[in-house]
Amino acid sequence: MTTALSRTSLIRREVNAQTRKVILVLGMHRSGTSAVTRCLNLLGAEIGSKLLPPAADNRSGFWEHADVMAIHEELLKDLGRVWHDARPLPEGWFLSPAARKARDKLARLIAGDFHGSALWAVKDPRLCRFVPLWREVLLESGFEAAALLAAPSAVPSSTSASISLSSPASATAPSGTSCSTS
């Protein structure tokens, strides 16, 4: 019987013989991306060491690189947006000074944290908005990217459960909003 450790070693050896790869785990909050990212990590994908700590609404952990989240947050702020803003990014954002700054920071992060990695994964709900930026940085860094998209069908019930965990006095959505699975 093969142990989990030897399976991980086999996966890493196979990947080392091929192109360096990164898996972009894409999905909104509460869509299962934390579980998917942790599974990828257990199967041998590096995720970095500077991870967001677990929280009351995600006791198993988010499995998100804290610096990636900070870079995304700064870019959103520089573009006049916030994480929960549904508006499109501004016209020409990709060529803006803010995007160039984020691109440089991501390149440094990748070179520092994942330079020796043949396979790694990155997850942050904000990542969906910045895929073009990531594709460019990864290509320049010598990585081939693959995207793994979390199905959004679980989001309403998971979000509802999260709201009730974080605010026991009120498990309902804020006034003027609704969640429906139909």
What are these regions (language model features)?
Residues 2-103:
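PAPS-dependent sulfotransferase catalytic core
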Residues 103-182:
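PAPS-dependent sulfotransferase catalytic domain
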Residues 1, 23-24, 117, 128:
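A general, composition-driven signal for non-globular sequence regions
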